[in-house]
Each structure stands twice: as structure tokens, then as C-alpha cells.
A protein has these predicted regions:
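Macromolecular interaction modules
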Residues: 1-120
Length: 120
């Protein structure tokens, strides 16, 4: 089954305040990611923990987007407004959005992101 590739990604780097990591991870996994991926146009979300290196934030989240406009949609803005609140000090966060430049389109059917070859 083919799965479309989004035209943009939002990456979020996070460093929880010392002593709040368990609460942070519970909130992020149980509330934040499911809330965000419920927004039309956010195709999926994944989280990562730093496994090598010490000059970067400990956590990374990547959200695949149909396109950048998703982050300006009424649905997204309402989702942010209605988000489950954090009951712990806010982590240090850096949020960046990247637009896909190559390939211009494609699917995941062959795991390359390139459009499938047409039979000759």
C-alpha cells in the first residue's frame, strides 16, 4: 500500500527541566503526540531520545505535514489552544519547519520517496 510523503516536516528539540523527565515523557506520549496527529494534515509524529552526543537537546520530535500551511490552519490553532496542559515546568523547546526540496513528490511504497517506476 502506498503512503504519500508530506511536503514538510516540523522538528521540535526539547530539553526537560531537571527532575521533570518522567512527567514530561508521560505527558508528551499520552497527550501531546496523539493530540497533534489528530489534526488534519499532520500525517504522523515520532519521538526520539538522544543516544550519542552531549551538545544537543535530549529529545526530538518529528511531525510529517502535508504542507506548511497545516500549521496556520484553524484546526491546528484550535488544537494548540485546547492542548492538555503541562503540570510541570515547561521544557526548553526549539521548533523548526522544513519544506521538502527533493524529491518533489513520491510515495513510501519503495522506501525511497521516489515515485514508483512505470512498467515499460
Amino acid at each position: 500500500m502506498e503512503q504519500a510523503i508530506g511536503k514538510a516536516v516540523m522538528v521540535v528539540f526539547m530539553e526537560p527541566v531537571e527532575g521533570t523527565e518522567l512527567e514530561f515523557n508521560d505527558w508528551y506520549n499520552r497527550h501531546h503526540v496523539p493530540e497533534r496527529v489528530s489534526v488534519p494534515g499532520i500525517l504522523n509524529g515520532r519521538r526520539y531520545e538522544l543516544s550519542d552526543g552531549d551538545e544537543a537537546p535530549k529529545y526530538l520530535a518529528i511531525y510529517e505535514l502535508e504542507n506548511e500551511s497545516v500549521l496556520h490552519s484553524d484546526a491546528y490553532l484550535q488544537n494548540v489552544k485546547d492542548s492538555t496542559p503541562m503540570n510541570f515546568p515547561r521544557p526548553k523547546v526549539q521548533r523548526l519547519v522544513y519544506r521538502q526540496v527533493f524529491p518533489e513528490s513520491g510515495t513510501f511504497d519503495d522506501k525511497t520517496g521516489f515515485p514508483p517506476s512505470k512498467p515499460t
